């Protein structure tokens, strides 16, 4: 091979020509690359079972029909509960129970809420999910983001589903003449649901009250999931049921587990019956309005066409060129899964229930959206940065929704889900998301009110212990401020995740860093200085004897145990070797704590050579990119490509752990493009190994950013040289501004590492925290 510089100069004319050439428009639907069932089975990746157990070995995704960040995830159901950690659908199951308007935190281990399930039947009426469940095969399924269908052989029904954000339309084709039924459950595990049949207006209405988990577990959230179902066909009978007991001609039923409604109608062979449904978190009228506004007709194919066009436009925000079909499937499947959350929470007229109480009903300004379900411990890392990059207006609305939560509840939430405080997981990462948005130039949210909220979390403890126990404020903030770390003596009792003192310290230090960057931009000098000092608190839990994170007592002594490779109560969901790398704000300071770059690299190497890297959980997600900071970006390129090939498979068991609201998938989107936001709240992305011949990002401001990787392949994973907008480029990072102002970045890829490219200290990401 020629020397890299000579090779680069030789290719400059080709690079310039490529930058001016646009790929031919593909006639292949981008939806055709997506199987929405990826992540619904136990993991089959190479590290499956090494770290995670039970539901941690599943992607915990669902094959949902939805609009990007829509309200409802319309999914087939094989599990009939809303209980924690049980997804509505698993690929292992062979019995179909119906269609659900799910509010599952996709890819997580939390709970569904406010849902209902409807099921078409033929011949015999069976009401409970267990009794009516009918065999199906995965070969008979078609599962895309805009359309789902399945054949139910026992019922001889072809069942199809498509929809919009808050509504859905179903088409059932009956293979034989006779009686047919529609059975509906309000899915209240607490036995608090209600349902009624309105034969005059041909509607079924009901509601399912929502309950909290984590802080305030089991308490009412103050609002319900209201649903409406409309049918066209004349019915011959209707009634209610409670488990196996039928109540013919009864118009409503409330309270108690296992309740529901049914209607009966006669069908001819091959007759198609169309049913519509919608939901609302406000009231019955909201559900009706949502259905009327989104699907005012009975044309199934028209709705399918509308949703297909929405998805095609959304996915085309990133165009890729590659001859590798599997790579396209993995990429667009990841982009689909990164488009679930946060979810739209308001009705079409802008109404939504108040945060943390459910009342009063609030009213948004026209054109605005209120979002909910922020799995923030996961998603601030890559999902929110991806939204901020591709859809900054939507990202701003998501941040303003956090501001509304502060205004309505009194505190910025930690992990806002089911429109409630939870204090689930650790850290204070709404700060990270808000800071990342503002630092990257997003301005369509109230930064002054946001700063007030963030600062309150960082400096104040709730005056009311009841509020604290209810999930408001940072856990163990008093200890953190007193010691500069959270000592082992503070067990953090008022939290779902107790203890985990070291992980909390590391995460608070990062959050303080991000808040400091916002303070600097807002000229809050005193806050900036104090928070910048606190951002170095990570040093207080790195044991100088080992260079690994370690538990520390109130008297300043570290634990004597030095096994950095075993799970421990002071670490969140992992071992010290995993969390040691959680210093995204100051990798250079971490090098100093470890004894210099050589020891830093040795420890980083061991994460991969000793199989300690755990991609199935978030604390490791930035680890592979941290070689860049030590001037060895070729190791980042190697590690990231290895993770992409081994931890993601285009199969039902294709995720190595919980997708966690799209974080796992957002990681893949960034990695496949060749850059990653190691430290959200800064404008820098670490470069990795671009995997496509061409990728085009269509920025919301009208600009396009093209990434061209000559000779990219599964073997040619190493950057030999790079050019940005016609000029040689040696930095191993790129800025947010470089991308959004548009341009072209060209890489020359090879099968051997160029250890000189990006290796100089001046080519590494800037050190911000001095």
What does each model-identified segment do?
Residues 1-8:
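Bacterial N-terminal signal peptides that target proteins for export
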Residues 18-19:
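C-terminal motif of bacterial Sec signal peptides marking the signal peptidase cleavage site
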Residues 24-384, 388-432, 438-506, 514-540, ...:
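Accessory carbohydrate-recognition regions in carbohydrate-active enzymes
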Residues 511:
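ATP-dependent phospho-/nucleotidyl transfer catalytic cores
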Residues 706-711:
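Beta-strand-rich recognition domains
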Residues 718:
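Extracellular attachment/recognition segments
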